Amino acid sequence: MGTIAAAALVSCASDGAIVVPEAPLEECVYMGDKTEFAVWAPDAEAAQLKLYTTAQEETPFKTMDMKLGKDGLWKATVKEDVKGAFYTFQVQKNGQWLEETAGIAAKAVGVNGTRGAVIDWNETNPEGWAEDKGPKIAPSDIIVYEMH
């Protein structure tokens, strides 16, 4: 579901020109008392942000219309603490609302990746993480057999 809808978001502006944001897309930026959301959909007619209590909740607890910027990004700011909530974007194209998607730049997702998760990245490191040191071995001496 999310992959198909996300692919539909990557497109051209209505005049055929490709509009690309200048900086890497920060889709969900948690700041405690507010969270900023953005999705790149330059040819969408409208976009909505939907917030859910859980990854599988049927009805959003908040739906917000998003505003289109000149860079093709639709943006919305939630002015409350929504840490732990899940989100989707829904865009309208050719008069039809497409399926909801977690977006193409979600850094954290819920069950099956269908919804993005609002995370405070400052709380994700385990105790002692900053002091952790990797093995002292030359990179040329490392052999990686399988990596996913």
Predicted regions and their residues:
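C-terminal motif of bacterial Sec signal peptides marking the signal peptidase cleavage site
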Residues: 8-11
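N-terminal export leaders
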Residues: 1-2
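Short proline/glycine-enriched turn/loop motifs at strand-loop junctions of beta-rich domains
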Residues: 40-47, 82
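The feature marks proteins involved in alpha-glucan
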Residues: 14-36, 68-146
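Solvent-exposed serine/threonine-rich low-complexity stretches and specific carbohydrate-binding patches
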Residues: 60-69
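Hydrophobic helical h-region of N-terminal Sec-dependent signal peptides
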Residues: 5-6, 39
